């Protein structure tokens, strides 16, 4: 027998219509899938605020011609070696590089790393994508 539990949800008609548009826009096949995803997202946010072990990816684009930029990036990465699991460097064009840093550890430390990398002069764009480490069903 499945561990799936059915329960009812009462919603205002306007909210339900907005939710159904959300489901269609995100290509969910049904409301249950969308609700499960939203619940997981909220539980994941809770993990990040409670300093539980988490995982994620930091991505940033930079001009590799910027003076001393690579040394600054490497210095910061070495300062946070305990949470960095892997890095991937991609040449986007002659001037721009994309770097993806896979991280796992304390969310406060990961956020500090992300902020430090994004704050370097020459980094054009950066973002932190959060995930869990498999604790959420």
UniProtKB/Swiss-Prot annotation:
The keyword Transmembrane helix does not apply. Binds 1 nickel ion per subunit. It holds the Pfam family NikR_C. GO terms for molecular function: DNA binding; DNA-binding transcription factor activity; nickel cation binding. CDD domains: RHH_NikR_HicB-like (cd22231). Ni(2+) binds at residues 78, 89, 91, 97. It comes from the Bacteria. Its cofactor is Ni(2+). GO terms for biological process: response to nickel cation. The keyword DNA-binding applies. HAMAP family: NikR. Belongs to the transcriptional regulatory CopG/NikR family. Transcriptional regulator. This is Putative nickel-responsive regulator. It comes from Syntrophus aciditrophicus (strain SB).
